[in-house]
Amino acid sequence: MGEHMDVTMDTRRAHEYFLNELCYSIGPKGLKEKIKNDVNSFNLIDVRGYDDYIDGHIPFAMHVPYDELEEHFNMFSKEKVNIIYSYSIVCQLAKKCAVKLTEKGYPVMELIGGFKAW
């Protein structure tokens, strides 16, 4: 195959990717359970636009738009997980926020499917 092996054929990297995705994501059902049983153990962060947040959001979610994230690091906790969501499964805003937060040492999970899946 040579040094230009198709990345999709690299089963070791694929295994690591999917294992990490399972560890750092939560589905709507899992989030509903956390809200019901242990709402104080995490922060829920909606990174969508203001109008979308006002039109509807997940209970207990704080609004921190993606483009204002760095101005609001003080709202997050390093002592509990910060669950981030954006619009839908195709939206990358939550992942981009997760990168920024983890660079600063904040524990993060992503809601699979975003608000649309909720």
Label every model-predicted segment.
Residues M1-N43, R48-D52:
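Flexible, polar/low-complexity N-terminal or interdomain linker segments that lie immediately upstream
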Residues K32, E70-N74:
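Short hydrophobic/charged patches on amphipathic alpha-helices used for structural packing
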Residues N43, M62, M109:
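Conserved beta-strand positions in the Rossmann-like core of class I SAM-dependent methyltransferases
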Residues Y53-P59, F76:
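Short loop/helix-cap segments at secondary-structure boundaries that form the rim of catalytic
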Residues V64-E70:
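Glycine-rich, highly charged phosphate/nucleotide-binding loops
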Residues F73-W118:
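Catalytic cysteine-centered active loop of the rhodanese-like fold, especially the PTP/DSP P-loop
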